[in-house]
UniProtKB/Swiss-Prot annotation:
Protein's name according to its UniProt entry: Proline--tRNA ligase
Enzyme category, top tier: ligase
Catalysed reactions listed for this entry: tRNA(Pro) + L-proline + ATP = L-prolyl-tRNA(Pro) + AMP + diphosphate
Entry text on domains: Consists of three domains: the N-terminal catalytic domain, the editing domain and the C-terminal anticodon-binding domain.
Organism taxonomic ancestry: Bacteria, Pseudomonadati, Pseudomonadota, Gammaproteobacteria, Lysobacterales
Gene Ontology cellular component terms for the protein in this record: cytosol
UniProt entry tagged with the keyword Metal-binding: no
Matches recorded under HAMAP family: Pro_tRNA_synth_type1
Pfam families: HGTP_anticodon (PF03129), tRNA-synt_2b (PF00587), tRNA_edit (PF04073)
Recorded GO MF terms: aminoacyl-tRNA deacylase activity; ATP binding; proline-tRNA ligase activity
């Protein structure tokens, strides 16, 4: 590839609306161009990177025994209604009508369509197990697209769907896919972690995420120093709290006229924040099943909404209004507690709160809190659940200490069980000739997201630093004055061919730019290896070589250069 014949359009300006480093650098490098909110055109340069990720993904999926197919991105409403996700998916599901007023959606994921394909193609257990995968564009109507292709509305994804007669077989394929994903991200040259996760809107019995480690990551990842335990914040669990200590104080009312937060109350009373209890008022359910719920966490902790939604009866809830708070508690926000409610309420306390003694909580009276409060003596024992976010320093289940890092989710694997197959009546005949609902797994990788995540992990002030496997070219041969010196141009072309013959993905920068501008472009677009061919170097029988990760260039003869690049 000669760059004089390639569309390479870099810019020096930093886009004002680009918040993440990857977004800024992809725009400056000319990898993407914005078409509309959350929609991006991939340039020839960006597409080279995208295709390299695709190739590795396909190779490892094929190696793992999956077979490629292709599902339409436009899918009928009826299919999504059968699983209940037409409504449940919410406004992220882009809904459209054709000229006959038939309603469709632009697929954000393809469990329904994959299951529909399987039920039409598979009739016997002898055809199982099977794992179908595709690399296909998806669309989610994000309310606020941001961060470039990191959270765009349209994105490229590899999604796979496996079908099984028995759960044991599903578990084996799940482990097979976890291994395949680990190979994919290892080959891409990324520092990644696999963590336990919540299944979210897709559902299922078990799921794990793959995250690229990056300080800019949106997700908090939790690790233990005592084992290989790892989970995202939504699913992370700390060890049980120590047993509750005996009461040592009498309950008393304290004057807190303007102190409405746990922090302010703790400061006023001169106590540690962890001795206070935070009360969150919610309304769960609808109609006759509606109930007022007071959720309690320690003052220095935060409610984990995912864990809370798994508590019986709390899968659908909202914050209570001030009018509802007044009706049920006879109080106002800032002074709430599980104390003498005006009407019957449900109290759900985090495990840590249930283990507290001599704590401080709102008195349900404006301007007052209660101190020295104890369960059993002053308040009835609450319903107990794990409903908080863990924190760095918490004790892990394995006895180690929990640590927290930031990550960018790039892959997710699920054991779906029979949720979709039952809804869509996807059955095969088993060994006894009886209809059996198939067990299902699904496995996704955000291919376009991987590109942005790799940049977040691999960059410096000059630009992108691609891992070799993802770079648009592994090596670029830069020619000094290609039009003015035929010998230099010929030597560069000859070297390019030798690099290709050696199996390297190489390009020739023969655009005739000034050396400084040419080198700056190569650093910006992240070329791992730069070789300079110049009249002076040829005279000495050497080439100037610089690794993108090195601070200085070095002069090498051809044999040493080829050995270095192939090593």
């Amino acid at each position: 590839m000669r760059l004089s014949q390639f569309h390479l359009h870099t810019t020096k300006e930093t886009p004002s609306d680009a918040e993440l480093t990857s977004h800024r650098l992809m725009l400056r490098a000319g990898m993407i161009r914005k078409l509309a909110s959350g929609l991006y055109t991939w340039s020839p340069l960006g597409l080279r990177v995208l295709r390299k990720v695709e190739r590795i993904v396909r190779e490892e999926m094929d190696r793992a025994g999956a077979v490629e197919f292709q599902i339409p991105t436009i899918q009928p409403k009826e299919l999504w209604e059968q699983t209940g996700r037409w409504q449940k998916f919410g406004p992220q599901l882009l809904k459209i009508k054709d000229r006959k007023d038939q309603v469709f959606c632009y697929s954000p994921t393809a469990e329904e369509a994959a299951c529909d394909f399987a039920r039409s193609e598979l009739s016997s257990y002898k055809q199982l197990p099977v794992n179908f995968y595709q690399v296909q564009t998806k669309f989610r109507d994000e309310i606020r697209p941001r961060f470039g292709v990191m959270r765009s509305r349209e994105f490229l994804m590899k999604d796979a769907y496996s079908f099984h007669l028995h759960d044991e077989c599903l578990v084996r394929e799940y482990e097979n896919m976890k291994s395949a994903y680990s190979r994919i991200f290892t080959r891409l040259g990324l520092d990644f972690r696999m963590v336990q996760a919540d299944s979210g809107a897709i559902g299922g019995d078990a799921s794990q995420e793959f995250h690229v480690i990056a300080d800019s990551g949106e997700d908090a990842l939790v690790f233990s120093t005592g084992s290989d335990y790892a989970a995202n914040m939504e699913a992370a669990i700390a060890a049980d709290p120590a047993p509750r200590a005996a009461a040592s104080e009498a309950m008393r009312k304290v004057d807190t006229p303007t102190q409405k937060t746990c922090e302010d109350v703790a400061a006023l009373l001169g106590i540690e924040l962890q001795r206070t209890v935070k009360s969150v008022a919610l309304i769960a359910g609808e109609g006759e099943a509606q109930q007022f719920v007071l959720v309690l966490v320690r003052g220095d902790h935060e409610v984990n909404e995912i864990k809370l939604a798994k508590v019986a009866g709390l899968d659908e809830q909202r914050f209570a209004s001030e009018a509802e708070i007044a009706e049920y508690l006879g109080s106002v926000p800032g002074f709430l507690g599980p104390v003498a409610p005006a009407k019957a309420i449900r109290v759900v306390a985090d495990r840590e709160v249930a283990a507290m003694s001599d704590f401080v909580v709102g008195a349900n009276e404006v301007g007052f809190h209660l101190a020295g409060v104890n369960w059993g003596r002053d308040l009835p024992e609450p319903e107990v659940a794990d409903i908080r976010n863990v924190r760095a320093g918490d004790r892990a289940l394995d006895g180690g200490e929990l640590k927290i890092a930031r990550g960018i989710e790039v892959g997710h694997v699920f054991q779906l069980g029979r949720k979709y197959a039952e809804a869509l009546d996807a059955t095969v005949l088993d060994e006894n000739g009886k209809a059996a609902v198939m067990a299902m797994g699904c496995y996704g990788i955000g291919i376009s997201r991987v590109v942005a995540a790799a940049i977040e992990q691999n960059h410096d002030d000059a630009g992108i630093i691609w891992p070799d496997a993802m770079a648009p070219w592994q090596v670029v041969v830069c020619v000094i004055n290609p039009k003015g010196d035929a010998a230099v141009a010929d030597a560069a072309a000859s070297l390019l061919q030798e690099l290709r013959d050696a199996g390297l993905d190489a390009a020739l920068d023969d655009r005739g730019l000034r050396p400084g501008a040419m080198f700056a472009d190569m650093e910006l677009i992240g070329i791992p290896h730069r070789v300079v061919v110049s009249e002076r170097g040829l005279g000495a029988g050497t080439y100037e070589y610089r690794s993108r990760r090195a601070s200085e260039a070095e002069s090498l003869d051809k044999a040493t250069l080829l050995q270095r690049l192939q090593g």
